[in-house]
Amino acid sequence: MDGIKYAVFTEKSIRLLGKNQYTSNVESGSTRTEIKHWVELFFGVKVIAMNSHRLPGKGRRMGPIMGHTMHYRRMIITLQPGYSIPPLRKKRT
């Protein structure tokens, strides 16, 4: 399992870093317990709570044909005080 795809850096996610909450996009087929186990094992931290939501895909036009991108899942991971995750790399666009 790959788990986390990449970190998300938006105004809201940067504001949540002050509350020890980390935002990242994950595989859409993964569950909360899988991601929680993977984060605790890989980073050596304790997860208190996880919030997730599925974001819709975007429309993409290819000539006269209208297509769309796949939906994806975003998780907000709350850690216990005293724990932190090192900075994740930002996805290149």
From Swiss-Prot:
Gene symbol of the encoding locus: rpl23-A
Superkingdom assignment: Eukaryota
Subunit structure: Part of the 50S ribosomal subunit.
Keywords: Chloroplast, Plastid, Ribonucleoprotein, Ribosomal protein, RNA-binding, rRNA-binding
InterPro entries: Nucleotide-bd_a/b_plait_sf (IPR012677), Ribosomal_uL23-like (IPR013025), Ribosomal_uL23/eL15/eS24_sf (IPR012678), Ribosomal_uL23_CS (IPR001014)
Gene Ontology biological process: translation
A GO molecular function held by the record: structural constituent of ribosome
Protein name per UniProt: Large ribosomal subunit protein uL23cz/uL23cy
Compartments, record wording: Plastid, Chloroplast
GO cellular component: chloroplast; ribonucleoprotein complex; ribosome
Function: Binds to 23S rRNA.
Any single Pfam family the record assigns to this protein: Ribosomal_L23
Family of this protein: Belongs to the universal ribosomal protein uL23 family.
